């Protein structure tokens, strides 16, 4: 008889519970299989004689996880209520401010002409186009972020438990439609009350319908996810709907059949939308158990990355989260990259490949080109302020969409450092692809502005002189440093932020605000002069020099640090 101690038993004497291993002794190398005799598992010291309880329900597991998180959070119920109150108040105040601004803008807009001018677009048609674009953007975002996912700790523990997965995933499945419904209601109410001057029961029905349609869109994405449809296909479907919005606007302008008013939704339509949303919600709930763990982990990871980027005001990380969520794992067509003849051309070719493979950024370029065109063909928006805002937003969208290669290089600079190129030269080469993209955008956007203000060739010439500013601003924003978290923090509804975060976020847009002054003045005066074009060329040169700088800090800050170092050295 050979005695076997329990694991962790430090006593040298034999345990009374023994196992008959046969006549042969057991050496240090372990017994041979033939020497082991039959034994009862109840006598095995590694398997205790314990009573097995019932498997807990999914709801109890969720509650246990929540209690454990609260126990280690270090926050009281009062602080939680304070945070919720602050967040809700901030959201309500923000919506009211936006609603007030849009209402003032709607009152300041000139009335529509009594007879619709050929080639124009009515304000109700513009609202319909914007809502269609919002539906496409929502579907694309839902596809990229899941929409149902499990965060890292939940995916590691919950998904492996022998319980009904439906009960574990119900809160995550309900979170997306609820957030989309709130956002959809806010957008529809702002557009209806601000631009179309709707009020009363009509506004209430429109807000409810907007909330239900937004929830239906997210639920459709969840149904597709439960049926094994790849997230990339859902995102591509949303991108196609988003591209269809400017196409519909162009078709309305060319045909001249633009509606003068949108039909007011009835209570029957609202009830029908609610029934559809309820049926889709029941279908999603019934299929939650069929969701594969891989898609849940990918969706949860992308959503966590996106939320962290929004809270930290990092647009680059947000773009990576949205792009990586629907990136293709392989490509059917492989380019031979014949344009890569050296380090410089290889860098430019890589940026072109990144832009070509990102459908989201190609769609962003198309939408950016349509904004100034829409602003010039809508009679109520064809004003100085409307055209200026459309050019500003559209130009920044086009430049930012084409600088994805620079943003990836900022995250992983090892490839750039392997090239025999100076850091300044690398940043200037990164401006080539944004410059080409903005050049194409300029021909369309500034051509439309030229038709609106007169002398299209002069406006296109001014826009070509401003192309380097857009490219330099996009590259400067891509290479901006991360906020310094060792500085004093400022409490905000979204959490604590360092004091210099706004200064970091402003890197890139600051060049657009300053170095495009001739373009802004020309739009304000509705004319282009030789002095404006000359000044724009000079400021474009300055923008390229600033955008290619490798210093993370500004000139004034560097001078102050040098003075401090001199004082310390003199002391």
Model-derived regions, located:
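Hydrophobic alpha-helical transmembrane segments of membrane proteins
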Residues: 2-9, 13, 17-19, 27-155, ...
């Amino acid at each position: 008889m050979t005695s076997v101690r329990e694991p962790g038993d430090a006593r040298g004497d034999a345990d009374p519970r023994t196992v008959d291993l046969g006549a042969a002794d057991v050496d240090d190398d372990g017994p041979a299989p033939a020497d082991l005799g039959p034994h009862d598992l109840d006598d095995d010291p590694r398997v205790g004689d314990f009573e097995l309880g019932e498997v807990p329900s999914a709801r109890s597991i969720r509650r246990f996880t929540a209690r454990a998180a609260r126990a280690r959070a270090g926050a009281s119920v009062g602080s939680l209520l304070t945070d919720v109150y602050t967040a809700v108040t901030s959201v309500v105040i923000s919506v009211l401010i936006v609603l007030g601004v849009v209402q003032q803008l709607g009152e300041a807009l000139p009335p529509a002409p009594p007879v619709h001018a050929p080639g124009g677009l009515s304000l109700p048609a513009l609202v319909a186009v914007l809502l269609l674009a919002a539906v496409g953007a929502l579907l694309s975002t839902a596809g990229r972020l899941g929409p149902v996912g499990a965060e890292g700790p939940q995916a590691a523990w919950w998904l492996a438990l022998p319980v009904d997965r439906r009960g574990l995933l119900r809160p995550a499945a309900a979170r997306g439609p609820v957030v989309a419904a709130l956002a959809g209601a806010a957008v529809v109410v702002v557009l209806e009350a601000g631009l179309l001057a709707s009020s009363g029961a009509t506004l209430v029905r429109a807000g409810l319908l907007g909330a239900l349609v937004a929830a239906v869109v997210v639920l459709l994405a969840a149904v597709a996810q439960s049926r094994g449809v790849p997230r990339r296909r859902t995102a591509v479907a949303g991108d196609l709907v988003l591209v269809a919005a400017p196409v519909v606007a162009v078709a309305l302008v060319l045909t001249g059949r633009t509606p003068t008013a949108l039909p007011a939704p009835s209570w029957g339509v609202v009830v029908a939308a609610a029934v559809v949303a309820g049926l889709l919600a029941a279908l999603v709930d019934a299929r939650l158990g069929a969701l594969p763990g891989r898609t849940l982990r990918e969706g949860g990871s992308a959503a966590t990355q996106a939320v962290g980027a929004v809270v930290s005001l990092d647009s680059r990380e947000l773009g990576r989260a949205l792009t990586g969520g629907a990136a293709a794992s392989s490509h059917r067509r492989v380019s031979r990259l014949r344009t890569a003849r050296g380090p410089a051309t290889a860098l430019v070719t890589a940026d072109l490949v990144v832009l070509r493979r990102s459908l989201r950024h190609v769609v962003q370029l198309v939408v950016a080109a349509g904004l100034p065109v829409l602003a010039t063909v809508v009679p109520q928006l064809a004003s100085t302020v409307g055209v200026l805002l459309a050019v500003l937003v559209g130009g920044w969208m086009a430049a930012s969409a084409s600088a994805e290669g620079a943003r990836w290089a900022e995250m992983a600079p090892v490839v750039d450092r392997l090239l025999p190129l100076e850091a300044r030269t690398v940043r200037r080469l990164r401006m080539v692809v944004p410059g080409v993209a903005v050049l194409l955008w300029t021909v369309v956007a500034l051509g439309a502005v030229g038709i609106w203000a007169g002398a299209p060739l002069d406006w296109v010439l001014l826009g070509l002189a401003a192309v380097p500013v857009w490219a330099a601003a996009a590259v400067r924003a891509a290479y901006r440093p991360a906020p310094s978290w060792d500085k004093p923090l400022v409490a905000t509804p979204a959490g604590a932020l360092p004091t210099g975060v706004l200064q970091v976020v402003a890197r890139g847009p600051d060049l657009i605000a300053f170095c495009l002054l001739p373009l802004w003045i020309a739009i304000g005066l509705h004319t282009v002069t030789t002095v404006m074009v000359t000044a724009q060329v000079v400021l474009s040169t300055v923008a390229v020099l600033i955008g290619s700088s490798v210093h993370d800090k500004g000139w004034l800050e560097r001078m102050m640090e040098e003075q401090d170092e001199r004082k310390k050295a003199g002391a």
